[in-house]
């Protein structure tokens, strides 16, 4: 069963892989798109905030820095998955079907978030050329 779930998650992640841009250029592009919308809506406060965000991205964003941050995020999410797996095993040992279902749901959601974070890490890794 676990192999089937893992395979289906990998399939979903593979389908979404090319659809999300990563890196500083992608962040800058997203802010630029929002900036165009905010200007069209004549939303001065939002324009000011987005222009500030754009300046910060241009000044401080680096793909290597994003890669390091994403590595930390993935490690933290892996710890979360491990904790939910431990809680699920404890609920099974205790014979609590209600808790087993709850812990299984939390584990599944956590694994999905981890998979998405790993996919983004891989995209950043390819962007900066690390193997």
Model-derived features with residue positions:
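Sec-dependent N-terminal signal peptides
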Residues: 4-12
